[in-house]
Amino acid sequence: MKLAITITLAILALCCSPASAEICQSFADIIQGLFLGTPASFEAAVEPFKPDADMKAATTQLKTLVDFLPKNTKDSILKLMDKIAKSPLCA
């Protein structure tokens, strides 16, 4: 469970690098699918990026881990991500 949270926050950190002034909408859709979508909808959101077999296996495993998180934990993570994305530190 902690692994899923750590990986997700690391992904978000990449999005808030000084090189990216705003979050790519596709990336935001993937994160939303990770936490709120079905496994099929999450796979569909990732598919346009043509992941190889290892990437697909990793994203499936991550989705499975996230799905085991309690709803209040997922909600809190999404709130934190939103707060980080809107922070002046990510501008």
Curated annotation (Swiss-Prot):
InterPro entries listed in its UniProt record: Secretoglobin, Secretoglobin_1C-like, Secretoglobin_sf, Uteroglobin
Keyword tRNA processing on entry: no
GO molecular function terms attached to this record: phospholipase A2 inhibitor activity
Entry keyword Transit peptide: no
Gene Ontology cellular component annotations, sorted alphabetically: cytoplasm; extracellular space
Tissue: Club cells (nonciliated cells of the surface epithelium of the pulmonary airways). Expressed in lung, uterus, and prostate.
Signal sequence range: 1-21
Keywords: Disulfide bond, Phospholipase A2 inhibitor, Secreted, Signal
Superkingdom classification of source: Eukaryota
Main location: secreted
Protein name: Uteroglobin
Organism: Equus caballus
